Amino acid sequence: MSLVERFTNCSCGPCANLNNSWYNATTANLINSGSMTHIVYNVYWPSPGECDPMHLLNKTDNDFRTNYYGCNSVPWVEINGTTFATAGGATGFTNAINTGNSQ
């Protein structure tokens, strides 16, 4: 089983586009098949100030993982600790999950 860690923010337009275009449906299928599980971390930027309520509810863990991976933009996805370029789309994402599961 692969671990996916996704970084996002409630005011991030590209994050919403990613979710609606392929991420939500693809991850639901992979979770239901037992291929992956995922954790979502909310960063405090790009919105001015710290206004993302999901970030504020778990600031310590969100900030720790963001800094651990050096995440400096959102959307950002890690698969088994390796950065995944979200431009790879659903096919690239599924292939990365399957590759991670075969190791």
Indicate where each model-derived feature is located:
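Generic structural motif recognizing short loop/turn segments at the entrances and edges of beta-strands
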Residues: 2-3, 34-39, 52, 73-75, ...
